[in-house]
Amino acid sequence: MANCITLNQTSYHGAGAIQSIPDEVKAHGLNKAFVCSDPDLIKFGVTKKVTDVLDAAKLEYEIYSNIKPNPTIENVQTGVAAFKASGADYFIAIGGGSSMDTAKAIGVIINNPDFEDVRSLEGVAPTTKPTVPIIAVPTTAGTAAEVTINYVIKDDEKQRKFVCVDPKDIPVVAIVDPDMMSSMPYGLTASTGMDALTHAIEGYITKAAWEMTDMFHIKAIEVIARSLRAACENDPKGREDMALGQYIAGMGFSNVGLGIVHSMAHALGAVYDTPHGVANAILLPTVMAYNADATGTKY
């Protein structure tokens, strides 16, 4: 069977990349943004960095902030109603995986109304139409949700997370601007960075891995290993390198999948609301030891 890779996206990298947003909005013929961003990012002025750019370009938007760190079915359902009422025709998702995953799920339901129950999206590509266009602006260097084909939603009632996978749902534009990450505290930088490292390591040893994805994952491991400590100290070069490293890891694992570190981390997050990167960091060494005999020369 042939190997396949999906890289259907325009991405901007580097300090000041958010200034590219108005040009992309105009290039795609978009009108009003539905800005998905969590309450803390709004409170501390991170979201405002982007809305200031929109204001300067006289672009219309509405902000939606009912987003939890592990986004829930309720976050998506209320978001669908708010999007319909807003008159928006695209998303700007500002945040970590929570904001971007919420935007993906809302957009899929908007364009596929037969899947109004978000739980029906679980699995691989059940829908016929892609999500509403998303411009993704990550504020953490970890999830790589801005470049991946999947999104994760929490079912509070059943205390589980479910994964939805569809190549049609990659954001049309990724704005990977390290200045959007400069206010991350030490602990969040470390935990999201460990999420990125886990992506790179697990993607490298999956059964679906091949030469092209190995190239992404090896480079991601190299970049993350040299830059995570510096990023935790808020070094600008460390921030920039981590932003790139986590994106490269996302390009890889989005095409070949992950492993049991992530499976167990999602379970912990669903039951205990454990921060995803923290769960990965705890589990990764034990899983690497468990997998060692099966990884050949890759370790």
Predicted regions and their residues:
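Short glycine-rich or small-residue beta-strand-to-loop segments that form or flank ligand, phosphate
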Residues: 33-38, 62-65, 91-94, 135, ...
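An N-terminal, well-structured beta->alpha segment
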Residues: 1-64
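Carboxylate- and glycine-rich phosphate/diphosphate-binding segment that chelates Mg2+/Mn2+
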Residues: 150-256
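Glycine/threonine-rich beta-strand-loop-alpha-helix active-site module
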Residues: 74-176
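N-terminal small/polar loop signature for handling phosphorylated ligands or for N-terminal nucleophile
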Residues: 42-115, 229-239
